[in-house]
A protein has these predicted regions:
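Long, well-ordered core segments of solenoidal/helical folds
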Residues: 1-11, 56-73, 127-138
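Solvent-exposed loop and edge beta-strand segments that line ligand/cofactor-binding
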Residues: 2-52, 69-78, 82-102, 156-168
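Short, solvent-exposed positions on alpha-helices
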Residues: 51-55, 119-123
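Extracellular Ig-like/FN3 beta-sandwich strand-entry sites
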Residues: 234, 292-294
Length: 425
């Protein structure tokens, strides 16, 4: 059996049983199993107040967040074993990032937050939720991704079903549980973790509190929360200030914003600004609440350029674009010219943002101001964009033509070889 080496099972990093958990400091093996395992370990450490065990799982989490986390919140870089590679192995065209692994990452980060009250875990949870996880299902709800590569040389599309059909059922189950991630309660502390419109009734001590949240987040940073206790009562409301609003895309140096300015954040109670008092990434509002109280959170959402740690060699010369918690992808289906995207040094400004209901219902499209080349390699779609002056030998053009003429190799080998020729592997 796993962990015991019985019934013919060999202890291995694949199953995370190559050494006792208390001695581990790197996340290895099958990504989904790792996320589920360490979710359970976090629970056990919390329930048993086992500091050594929690320190071990926190070391593993730090390794994941600082060396093995994709910008979209996905985990698991290797198709082989559906798992992790060495530190900083974050390739873009041949990565795996299974949908189930993103779900497991949400589970794990939620438990790490519950054990500590630290918002950094919710920052990773939110990034994964809005990018790596939700991409696993189509807007129509009937097609799914098993793996989620950051880029593809064409041909990678959502499927209606899989021989190993863990992801469709898992993502369906998860979507129904999202309301449970919005708030958390610890005695007289109420945490506002996610910004999602809706009504919730919470039990805070012996007081029933109704919270009505109104927002269009993540499309803008305006949030209103109506607080209605059934009686006047003193308790603390902790409103999370997301990492992206504090000039930090992830809680490590794995990714940083090129544009160094901090978005402006304001918190008002009944129209009056509150004195800034933070705890573990939360804006703390301690007061006696009464019916009719309203909390207003406003966060600027500039377009941000993101670069990876220099040790991620696959991302050298590359930038990503984000706005708020959303990582943007380039739509390239109508880009007929074989060319590269180029971003200049000056900040990028958003010109407008809209929903094209006739095309894809709830999907939002953004247009950008400023000098930039908007053409792309036909058939490619990648979340990262190339900076000017990098790989000017036309290798991307020749690689693509070579792929189109290849008829005997499998898709995965084509993708892998293309990445190697382009310098991404």
């Amino acid at each position: 059996e796993t962990g015991r080496g019985t019934d013919g099972h060999k202890l291995s990093p694949y199953s995370q049983d190559h050494k006792p958990i208390i001695d581990q400091d790197e996340i290895v093996g099958h990504a989904v199993r790792a996320g589920y395992l360490f979710s359970g370990v976090t629970d056990v450490a919390s329930l048993q107040h086992d500091k050594k065990l929690f320190d071990a799982v926190n070391r593993v989490w730090e390794n994941m967040a600082s060396k093995k986390l994709y910008l979209n919140g996905g985990i698991g870089s290797r198709p082989q074993g559906e798992g992790f590679g060495p530190n900083y192995e974050l390739n873009n065209f041949n990565n795996y990032c299974e949908t189930c692994a993103s779900i497991a990452n949400v589970y794990w980060n939620q438990r790490m937050f519950l054990a500590t009250g630290d918002s950094k875990y919710i920052d990773v949870l939110e990034r994964t939720l809005y990018n790596g996880l939700i991409a696993g299902v189509s807007l129509s709800g009937d097609k799914f991704f098993y793996d989620n590569p950051m880029g593809t040389p064409g041909g990678h599309a959502r499927q209606q079903w899989f021989g190993c059909a863990c992801c469709p059922g898992n993502v369906t189950r998860f979507m129904a549980s999202v309301p449970g991630y919005v708030y958390a309660i610890d005695k007289k502390d109420v945490y506002v973790n996610l910004f999602v419109g809706g009504n919730s009734k919470l039990k805070v001590g012996d007081t029933e509190v109704e919270l009505v949240q109104k927002t269009q987040y993540p499309w803008n940073g305006d949030v209103e929360i109506d607080v209605t206790p059934n009686k006047n009562d003193k308790f603390t409301l902790l409103v999370r200030i997301p990492g992206w609003a504090k000039n930090r895309p992830v809680p490590s140096d794995l990714y940083t914003y090129v544009d160094g300015s901090n978005p402006q954040v304001k918190v008002l109670v009944n129209g009056s600004e509150t004195k800034k008092h933070t705890r573990a990434g939360y804006w703390v509002i301690e007061r006696e609440w009464k019916k009719g109280d309203k909390v207003t959170l406003t966060m600027d959402m500039p377009v941000r350029r993101v670069e990876a740690n220099p040790q991620v060699r696959y991302d050298k010369g590359m930038l990503a674009m984000e706005r708020g918690p959303i990582l943007n992808a380039l739509e390239c289906k109508d880009q007929k010219r074989e060319n590269r995207v180029s971003l200049r040094k000056e900040p990028v400004k958003r010109s407008r943002s809209s929903r094209r209901k006739c095309l894809c219902r709830r999907k939002r499209f953004c247009q950008w101001k400023g000098n930039r080349k908007a053409s792309y390699i036909q058939g490619y779609s990648i979340l990262y964009m190339e900076q000017p002056g990098y790989r000017t030998d036309g290798s991307m053009d020749s690689c693509y033509k070579r792929i189109r003429n290849s008829k005997t190799r499998t898709y995965n080998s084509i993708r892998s070889n293309a990445c190697r020729r382009m310098g991404f592997q």
